[in-house]
Regions:
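Terminal domain-start segments
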Residues: 1-25, 118-141
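Short consensus segments that form the blades of beta-propeller domains
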Residues: 8, 37-44
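Acidic/hydrophobic-patterned starts of short beta strands in beta-sheet-rich repeat architectures
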Residues: 21-35, 76-83
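Short glycine/acidic-enriched loop and turn motifs that connect beta-strands
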Residues: 35-39, 89-90
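Polybasic, low-complexity, intrinsically disordered segments
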Residues: 42-45, 57, 87
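Acidic, small-residue rich beta-repeat scaffolds with periodic aromatic anchors
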Residues: 72-141
Length: 141
């Protein structure tokens, strides 16, 4: 799978950063042009990412894109799910489907400026436990 993803990654410009992940027990390639960090080639985190997976024929399919709301909330993973957040929302994404995988929203909570629900507070606590995805400009793993 990684060789297929590596070959595919050559289609992106030099500003693209990449990460491999396992989401809902499916290998995916994450591609972002919106990364930040202290080092140009390592330890980068992303504000947004496009998600690619392999279908049952081994062909790459685009699952979609997700976006967080600032550097406090980088694209993260917890329990084999992708997570993004902002000041007033948290979204959790998984992948469903065997032959033709699809991105699915597992959970989404948001609130107005003044009132955070118990559910949203619980999701923010989960987000704090999530591990930010580490992106690199080099596909060498």
């Amino acid at each position: 799978q990684n060789e297929v993803f590596k070959s595919f990654a050559q289609n992106f410009g030099k500003s693209a950063a990449f990460a491999y992940a396992n989401i809902s027990n499916k290998p995916v390639l994450l591609v972002s042009h919106e990364v930040f960090g202290n080092d140009e080639n390592e330890e980068l985190e992303a504000l947004a990412t496009s998600i690619f997976a392999l279908d049952s024929d081994g062909k790459i399919v685009t699952l979609g894109s997700i976006r967080s709301q600032g550097t406090l909330y980088p694209v993260s993973i917890l329990d084999n799910k992708l997570m993004v957040a902002g000041h007033h929302f948290v979204s959790v994404y998984g992948i469903r489907g065997e032959g033709e995988p699809e991105l699915e929203i597992v959970c989404h909570e948001e609130s107005d400026m003044n009132n955070h629900s118990k559910e949203l507070k619980a999701l923010f606590e989960k987000f704090e436990q999530a591990k930010p995805v580490t992106f690199t400009h080099l596909l060498n793993k």
